[in-house]
Amino acid sequence: MQAVEFSKGDYTALLIPGMGANLIRLTNTRLGAEILRAPADDEVETFKGRPHVFGLPILFPPNRIEDGRYTFGGRTYRFPITNAKEHHYHHGILKSQPFAVSKAWETGEEVLVECRYYSNAGNDAIFRDFPHEFKCKITDRKSVV
């Protein structure tokens, strides 16, 4: 898994673009304090299967969708059941999709990393369940403040 580590001031961050651009670690290096729940070395497989329980995942659409389907604007959307016990789709179509780092730069006071994901008819992983072309862009920034 490709990881992007970046630091500014007292903070170091670790971003995994290939798993939903999840910022899985944020550490205050001066205090030695972990800010986010990051996967331990023995939890890598858990992270791959359940990325929404670590870091700052993108959870679009959020929450749970009962029976894996809903209707909006006269159109019914169907998602795979991801929680069999409660029979619903759970937390988002982007959480494990491969984002690409589109830009990384530093200003005097900030370090920024921008990741993008494009969904279109050629991307069966999402388009099958959510047949809309869209672009998701997320920028993580760490500043001195």
Regions found by a protein language model. Give the residues of each.
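Surface-exposed acidic/polar loop and edge beta-strand patches at domain peripheries
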Residues: 1-139
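Conserved small/polar residues in nucleotide/adenosyl-binding loops
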Residues: 144-145
